């Protein structure tokens, strides 16, 4: 069997959080979470998982890469930029457990991965991949020229028989305006094969619409397979020309839910670990729910390896 490959594009940042008088340090990023959880759930000879970003030449960046390699995520497409650093965010938790996030990322290395001397070579390599996965955040951190260049890469990948997967993860503060985001998402969906959506993000960006209208709009943009993630509710899978699937989530007692930080990222990973290996959408959605329901029972985006579902 030929080993297929997936390139997951995005940004991973240094995470600082306060515990009493101490600061805890970790690493976090939506697409990185997905990369790790796919890597943990596929057989190594079935799918190679590559992460695509830019980092600095600092020790934090080196630690990040080492931790990804331990997870089986390939780092050969990651660039190290001399004059840049990874972004950073701080999580402040108040007495009620409510969290506030503060970001320092405006000049992070990841913003420049398509502007570096190696960008042409990496773009050519990406065009040969079986799958490319990215999120709304992967788009948001790029300038207009880099976004246009990325779309060219995605179109080339599809022309070569590859598939593009997009998660609509929308963070308004990363965009200049809704108009800019709508245009970028429309361009993106026009070259997407599988789209992961949450209705919260859809409503925030496009205005509230019934689910069937959201599906109609997304299919109309050119997407063949649309997966709507609905947290503790059943997910919906709509494949062009097939009956709508509704797959129930795994119900957990309230006291078991510890941290929903990476629920959506891990659902996508579970889904893709089955779907990209030839599994049905029904089985993929079940795996997505199982992965997410496991992850939210632990603190932090990346749970211990031994806690992963069988």
UniProtKB/Swiss-Prot annotation:
This is 2-dehydro-3-deoxygluconokinase. InterPro entries: Carboh/pur_kinase_PfkB_CS, PfkB_Carbo_kinase, PfkB_dom, Ribokinase-like. Substrate binds at residues 29-33, 89, 103-105, 171, 265. SUPFAM superfamilies: Ribokinase-like. Signal peptide: none annotated. ATP binds at residues 169-171, 229-234, 262-265. The keyword Cytoplasm does not apply. It is an enzyme of class 2 (transferase). Catalyzes the phosphorylation of 2-keto-3-deoxygluconate (KDG) to produce 2-keto-3-deoxy-6-phosphogluconate (KDPG). It catalyses: 2-dehydro-3-deoxy-D-gluconate + ATP = 2-dehydro-3-deoxy-6-phospho-D-gluconate + ADP + H(+). The active site is at 265 (proton acceptor). It comes from Dickeya dadantii (strain 3937). The keyword RNA-binding does not apply. Induction: Expression is probably repressed by KdgR, which binds to its 5'-UTR. Pathway: Carbohydrate acid metabolism; 2-dehydro-3-deoxy-D-gluconate degradation; D-glyceraldehyde 3-phosphate and pyruvate from 2-dehydro-3-deoxy-D-gluconate: step 1/2. GO terms for molecular function: 2-dehydro-3-deoxygluconokinase activity; ATP binding; nucleotide binding. GO terms for biological process: D-galacturonate catabolic process; D-glucuronate catabolic process; DNA damage response; phosphorylation. Its EC number is 2.7.1.45. GO terms for cellular component: cytosol. CDD domains: KdgK (cd01166). Belongs to the carbohydrate kinase PfkB family. Keywords: ATP-binding, Carbohydrate metabolism, Kinase, Nucleotide-binding, Transferase.
């Amino acid at each position: 069997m030929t080993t297929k490959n997936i390139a997951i594009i995005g940004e991973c940042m240094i995470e600082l959080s306060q515990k009493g008088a101490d600061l805890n340090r970790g690493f976090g990023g939506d697409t990185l979470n997905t990369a790790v959880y796919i890597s943990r759930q596929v057989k190594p000879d079935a799918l190679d998982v590559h992460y695509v970003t830019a980092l600095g030449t600092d020790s934090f960046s080196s630690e990040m890469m080492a931790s990804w390699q331990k997870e089986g995520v390939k780092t050969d497409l990651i660039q190290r930029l001399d004059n840049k650093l990874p972004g950073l965010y701080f999580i402040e938790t108040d007495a009620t457990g409510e969290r506030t996030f503060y970001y320092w990322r405006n000049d992070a290395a990841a913003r420049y991965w398509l502007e570096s001397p190696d960008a042409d070579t990496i773009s050519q390599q990406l065009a040969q991949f079986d799958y490319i996965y990215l999120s709304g955040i992967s788009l948001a951190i790029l300038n207009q020229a880099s976004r246009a260049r990325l779309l060219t890469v995605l179109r080339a990948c599809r022309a070569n028989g590859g598939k593009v997967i997009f998660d609509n993860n929308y963070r308004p503060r990363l965009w200049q305006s809704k108009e800019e985001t709508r245009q970028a998402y429309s361009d993106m969906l026009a070259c997407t094969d599988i789209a992961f959506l949450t209705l919260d993000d859809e409503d925030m960006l496009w205005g509230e619409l019934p689910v069937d209208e959201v599906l109609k709009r997304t299919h109309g943009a050119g997407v063949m397979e649309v997966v709507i993630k609905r947290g503790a509710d059943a997910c919906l899978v709509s494949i062009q020309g097939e009956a709508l699937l509704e797959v129930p989530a795994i119900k957990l007692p309230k006291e078991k839910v510890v941290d929903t930080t990476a629920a959506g990222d891990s659902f996508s990973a579970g889904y893709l670990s089955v779907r990209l290996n030839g599994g049905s959408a029904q089985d993929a959605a079940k795996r997505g729910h199982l992965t997410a329901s496991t992850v939210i029972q632990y603190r932090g985006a990346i749970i211990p390896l031994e806690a992963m579902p069988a």
